[in-house]
Structures are given as C-alpha cells and as structure tokens.
C-alpha cells in the first residue's frame, strides 16, 4: 500500500492540496505538514521558528500600539472611559497615568506616548521576525548553540523554562517599582472617591496574608484571590510572585529534571505546547473572574461597576430617594415581608433588602464609609450620606456590566440605562471564551503528544475497527 504520510509526521493527514505546493522551500514532502499547518513545518528549524515567534510578537505589539492610538484619537475626556468602548486606556489609567482625583482624565499625552512606543517596538520586532524567517540561519544549534535546542533535551528545556520564569518575575517587579518609586498607582479606595496616584509605602509581605488568599473558599463572601481589596496586598503579592518566579527560574537553570519528572512528563515540542496552552487556559479563567468581580485591581471608575456593585447601587439610590420622601428605611417592609430597603443576613449583618440581597458581600469604595461593625449602619445612612456617593451610585446603577453583541447594555427595566457594553463585560467574556478555546487546544495537543510518545500516533487500524464487526443498521 502506498504510504500516505512522511515518516517525520505524527499521523496521516489527507489534504486536498498535493505535495507539490512549496512555501519558502518548506513543503509537505519534506516536513510532513501542508502549508496551512503553519509553524508545524518549522518544528525542527529553530532559526525559522524563532523568526515566526518574533514576528508574532511584532504583530501583537503593533496591535497594542495601533489600538492604543485609536482609543486616544476617539477619547472624550468628559465621558467615563467605560462608556466609550475602551479596553486599553483603562489599564493605563489604573497604573496612574494621566488621571486626577476621582479617576478624571486630566492628560492624554501619556496614552499617546504609550501607543507610539509600542508602534516603534513593533517595527523592531517586525524587522527581527522577517530577518530570522527569511534571511537568518535555518537552525541555531550550529552557529549559536546557546540559543539552539533539541526538543527531547530535558536539561535544555528546563533551562529555557527557567529563563521564561525569570522574565515573568521581572515583569511582576515592574509593577512593584511603579507603585513604590515611579509615581504610584491609582487608588480607588482613597477617601472621597479615588486618588490619582498613591505611592505604596506599607507593603503587605506577611506570608499568612498573601498565601491566605489561596486558602480561601471560592464561593460566597470568601472569594479566593479575587477578593483582594487593597493595593498593599496586590503589590505585596507581586513581590512574592516575582521572587518565586525569579528563584524558581534560577533553580530550573541550575538543576536537571528529577527522575520522577523525566518519567512522568512527555518531552516533545507538542507536549510543551499543550502544557503552555493548559496554563494559559487557567490564567484566562482566573482573569475572567478577577475582571468581573474585583473593583480594586480593575477600578470601577475606568472599567465600569461590577454586576453586584451596579445592583447594590440601585438599592442605595432608591433608599436615598425614598428616605428623602419620608420613608422609614429601617422598618419598611417589602412585598415578601422582608425589609424593603434594609434586612438582616442569616449571620445578622445589616444588608440591602430586595433582590440585591444576593450581593450582600459587595465591597465598594462609595459604600464602605456607611458600614458599621454589624453591616450597614442605620444612623450613618440617615445622616452621613455624601453627594459624591449619591452621584456615583446613580451613575453605576445605570451602567450595569450587562449587554450583548448588539450593544444593548444596562438593566433592561431601568429607563435611564445607557446603550453600551461595559469593558468589564468585554474583558471577562473574552478571557472566558479564549480560556475555553485554549483548554480545548491543551486537550488536543496533549492527546497527540501522549499518543506519539506511546507509539500509536498513526490512529486506529481501519481493518480492525469495532464497527466492522457490528450488524448493519437495517
């Protein structure tokens, strides 16, 4: 029987395109992969694969710079960021660039600089990618052994892993240095409704606090790491993570894999791809929850309110209105017999009544000043509500992070809601969807890598398929 596949490929793929189509000298006959398989043709060409990765980085950075400048060009300072469909400027504002008290944007020049720097960087990466893809050596092992590798070389692979971990650790410390030494970061919890820049002076480095987040429940008021609500803990956590990544990187560079790791793991290019996709899927799912629920790392001034925040803001807004109209908010009953404005949680805490009771564990900068030791404080609700709290809750009430692809956002029953989709909705949904696809990719490539390692990568022998021994359907 004529062999349908190259000995170098893992399993046969029949394609409408025959092997005569050559792309840059890397055709199906020599690599076992058709042109549309992309970088799979470069599995054993480390120099060309480097070019593909550098060019890919250039495309990513180009998008970041171009989209950054596009958002700057369309930005209207008088409107909140979350009403303008912005997904990049909120990140820059969170780092404290260009913002004043209350999250008001007072200078867009830093955003312009960011976009231009990314465009310049993308040009450098683009030239590097083109050079290595077209002109540079096909393989690096002979000319530049430090940068060369063989996929099955376990020691080299863990060295590369170590270098990546060190780079990630340096990235974590960049945020730490920004918060400590280079102007600080935006603090949504500053008194009076947010502060433009606050240098962090009292880092949380206690391991019991930092790692305590990991031991919290995922559910209810616990909220795992997503429940972090002060900058000291966030920046302190980056000190810990950066240190762990850097020391872990040094460890992986200096050591060789233990025997159990050599036995347990599959050591091939496709296996490393599957591990990476699995890790990215986990990151995507965590980021989805973080963006959706956390209003400290993702301040509501820039990203719009969280879902629970918009709901509690609605309850607060109508409490303020009806209290002014003479309602006794402490004792008024709702249609179910529970408190209309205020009620007690099962643990005795005073919380907002009505449907928003499910979001009793919300913490938000505009609401916390009205809490006492047992939840919401009735005397503070009667005497201490400030105009900025009323304005902010009314704004957040009409900007719930709900919406669909046709941009009908806001709560459908609220006549003053705005037609928009919140950046929170975009960012959390996109990270969930991409995380899911990456997880599927992880399963796919893990299955292929394990099959190749086990030696049955060519699929089931068609002569012995179970279906052949079964009776016909009719």
From Swiss-Prot:
> Which InterPro entries does the UniProt entry name for this protein?
PS_antenna-like, PS_II_antenna-like_sf, PSII_PsbC, PSII_PsbC_sf
Q: Which GO terms describe its molecular function?
A: chlorophyll binding; electron transporter, transferring electrons within the cyclic electron transport pathway of photosynthesis activity; metal ion binding
Modified residues annotated as N-acetylthreonine in this record: 15
Q: Which residues form the propeptide?
A: 1-14
Fill in the subunit field for this protein: PSII is composed of 1 copy each of membrane proteins PsbA, PsbB, PsbC, PsbD, PsbE, PsbF, PsbH, PsbI, PsbJ, PsbK, PsbL, PsbM, PsbT, PsbX, PsbY, PsbZ, Psb30/Ycf12, at least 3 peripheral proteins of the oxygen-evolving complex and a large number of cofactors. It forms dimeric complexes.
In this chain, [CaMn4O5] cluster is annotated as bound at 368
Where in or outside the cell it occurs: the entry states: Plastid, Chloroplast thylakoid membrane
Pfam families this protein is in? PSII (PF00421)
Q: Which residues carry this modification: Phosphothreonine?
A: 15
Domain of life of the native organism: Eukaryota
Q: Which family does the entry's similarity section mention?
A: Belongs to the PsbB/PsbC family. PsbC subfamily.
Name of the featured protein: Photosystem II CP43 reaction center protein
């Amino acid at each position: 029987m004529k062999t349908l596949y190259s000995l170098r490929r893992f399993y046969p793929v029949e394609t409408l395109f025959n092997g005569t189509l050559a792309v840059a000298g890397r055709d199906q006959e020599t690599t076992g992969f058709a042109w549309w398989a992309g970088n799979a043709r470069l599995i054993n060409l480390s120099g060309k694969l480097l070019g593909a990765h550098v060019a890919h980085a250039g495309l990513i950075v180009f998008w970041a710079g171009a989209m950054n400048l596009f958002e700057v060009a369309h930005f209207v300072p008088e409107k909140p960021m979350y009403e303008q469909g912005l997904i990049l400027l909120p990140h820059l504002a969170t780092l404290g660039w260009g913002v004043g008290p209350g999250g008001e944007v007072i200078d867009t020049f830093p955003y312009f600089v960011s976009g231009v720097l990314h465009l310049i960087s993308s040009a450098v990466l683009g030239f590097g990618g083109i050079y290595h893809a077209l002109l540079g050596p096909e393989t690096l092992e002979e000319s530049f052994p430090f940068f060369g590798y063989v996929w099955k070389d376990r020691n080299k692979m863990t060295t590369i892993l170590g270098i990546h971990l060190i780079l990630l650790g340096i990235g974590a410390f960049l945020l730490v240095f920004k918060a400590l030494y280079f102007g600080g970061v935006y603090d949504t919890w500053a008194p009076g409704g947010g502060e433009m820049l606050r240098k962090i002076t009292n880092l949380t480095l206690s391991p019991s606090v930092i790692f305590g987040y990991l031991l919290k429940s995922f559910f209810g008021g616990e909220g795992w790491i997503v429940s972090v609500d002060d900058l000291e803990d966030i920046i302190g956590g980056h000190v810990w993570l950066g240190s762990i990544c850097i020391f872990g990187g040094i460890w992986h560079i200096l050591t060789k894999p233990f025997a159990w790791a050599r036995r347990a793991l599959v050591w091939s290019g496709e296996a490393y791809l599957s591990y990476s996709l699995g890790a990215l899927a986990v990151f995507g799912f965590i980021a989805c929850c973080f963006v959706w629920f956390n209003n400290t790392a993702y301040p509501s001034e820039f990203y719009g309110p969280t879902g629970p925040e918009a709901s509690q803001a609605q309850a607060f807004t109508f409490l303020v209105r009806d209290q002014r109209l003479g309602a006794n908010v402490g004792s008024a009953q709702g249609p179910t017999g529970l408190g209309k404005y205020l009620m007690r949680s099962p643990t005795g805490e005073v919380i907002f009544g009505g449907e928003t009771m499910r979001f009793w564990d919300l913490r938000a900068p505009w609401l916390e000043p009205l809490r006492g030791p047992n939840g919401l404080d009735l005397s503070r609700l009667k005497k201490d509500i400030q105009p900025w709290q009323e304005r902010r809750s009314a704004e957040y009430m009409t900007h719930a992070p709900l919406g669909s692809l046709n941009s009908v956002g806001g709560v459908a029953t609220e006549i003053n809601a705005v037609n928009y989709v919140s950046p929170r909705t975009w960012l959390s949904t996109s990270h969930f969807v991409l995380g899911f696809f990456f997880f599927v990719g992880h399963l796919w490539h893990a299955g292929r890598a394990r099959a190749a390692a086990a030696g049955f990568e060519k699929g089931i022998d068609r002569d012995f398929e179970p279906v052949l021994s079964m009776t016909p359907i009719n």
